[in-house]
Amino acid sequence: MNNTALVMNKISQLPVQQRQEIIGLLEELEEAKAKESSRTDFITFVKRMWPSFIAGRHHSIMSDAFERVANGELKRLIINMPPRHTKSEFASYLFPAWFLGRYPEKKIIQTAHTAELAVGFGRKVRNLINQEDFQEVFPGISLSADSKAAGRWNTNKKGDYFAIGVGGAVTGKGADVLIIDDPHSEQEAALGAYNPDVYDKVYEWYTSGPRQRLQPGGAIIIVMTRWSTRDLTGQIIKSATQREGADEWEVIELPAILPSEEPLWPEFWPLDQLQALKAELPVSKWSAQYQQDPTAEEGALIKREWWQEWEYDSPPPCEAIIQSWDTAFLKTQRADYSACTCLLYTSDAADEERG
């Protein structure tokens, strides 16, 4: 018999009143431990605030990253993940509330591709902080008396929350945490299919606006679905690899279907439903939005199954050899190296063309 069983056996032998008092004290102790866990462990907080929450493997990954941001261990985080996988619920609703519960004096700037959406997040966070179950976890934390606007409010400890859409002005605002949630709209992505330059305006706004509003030691969280190699994730990663001293990012990619052919979130998205969705979408959209790979080989002009192998010393007979060079011009540690592609126009290919 283990210690718990021994204790419960002893309690069961006590008079009814004493037994009820002890059980009541034990329940209070368990509740106190649960509240403390909710303050320090993000996923525990999520389950307490959202009892019907269906946990998946990716939620543990996201929670670990958010905890490291809150603890000051991670300053630049990008999470790329598919639609309808609780991206916004975690990053733009539950995390800001939990963070301000822990650090009610901090400042958050929340962005989304429209001001309406960003303000909607602010309203949900504000309402959650006002709820009794939140107050039980973070007693003494509330909104200031004059905090009525959904997208602009303060805590009673002089913390600040400010919500804006992409392109909005952030002059005069500072952020200990900047959260960017899906900065690109579907309409923008549709235009981007024909004119990739449309993605540049988001990157230019990010660098000229929100990025400059970060407090010393502040953190940036970007959660988004991929659309293009020119989207915000793509341009930030490119900058990080090409510019000396640029921000260094931790990038978490969460594809809807894993390399093992298992769904990322089988508890909510069964494989057959994802495969049906894949069959209905253009390859480029599925690869980018659901697999977080806007350069997936399925959408490439040259496909993997076309490649053939031969022994190094015995290449096939060829009619011509073509070389294409991509040279590196930057002399920095992060500069891309020079690369060469050598193409052989083989005799059998020439024979097929001739006849």
Task: Show where each model-derived region lies.
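ATPase catalytic-site recognition across NTP-hydrolyzing enzymes
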Residues: 261-327
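Conserved P-loop
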Residues: 80-82, 87-133
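N-terminal accessory segments
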Residues: 1-75
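Conserved nucleotide-state-sensing and coupling region of NTP-binding domains
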Residues: 111-170
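Signature of the SF2 helicase/ATPase Hel1-core->accessory helical subdomain module
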Residues: 180-256
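Conserved small/polar residues in nucleotide/adenosyl-binding loops
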Residues: 345-353
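An active-site-proximal beta-strand-loop segment
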Residues: 325-338
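Conserved RecA-like ASCE ATPase "motif II neighborhood" in helicase/translocase motors
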Residues: 151-195
